[in-house]
Amino acid sequence: MSVLFSIKDDFRYDIVRKIFEGGMAVVYEAEQHGAKQFVKRVAIKVIRQSFADQQMFIDNFIGEAKLVADLIHTNIVQTYQFGELNGIYYIVMEYINGVNLEQFAQQMGDKNKKLPSELAVFIASRVCRGLAYAHNKTDKNGKLLGLVHRDVSFKNIM
């Protein structure tokens, strides 16, 4: 048997800190450890404990993981892995260092500054590029997936 068929899911994650709490999940910054002191910074989205036994929320979380798995675009956070451990589902994603748009707007407001219009247009254009890519995404047979982002908000834009 080739080595490729022998590789097992042997990732180890160490939680560094909580990044964000949403309605359905909590996102943590973590370190993924591999062979020879390999370390990669990742984000891990974990279904909230209060929803971990509610099938509707579990199904929604699994559905989200499946939908975003093949979205590969510079303006969309990459998904690396989906898993389950002791009945708790999680999604391992690209870690984006920095603040979200809500935090950035607050920082600007705290300094009595306004977001320059050129920067606002740039941010909006990048958000639109990511949304357009997702909206036009097709399956392997060329059929539109019909993806719609249901939570476009300042806190979900990095």
Task: Give the label of every model feature segment.
Residues 28-31, 37-48:
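Glycine-rich ATP phosphate-binding loop
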Residues 123-124:
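Activation segment signature within eukaryotic-like protein kinase domains
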Residues 48-70:
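AlphaC helix of the eukaryotic protein kinase fold
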Residues 128-147:
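Protein kinase catalytic-loop region centered on the HRD/HxD motif
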Residues 86-100, 104:
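Conserved short submotifs of the Hanks-type protein kinase catalytic core
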Residues 101-115:
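AlphaC helix of the protein kinase catalytic domain
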Residues 82:
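Activation-segment/catalytic-loop signature of the eukaryotic protein kinase fold
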Residues 16-23, 27:
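Protein kinase glycine-rich loop
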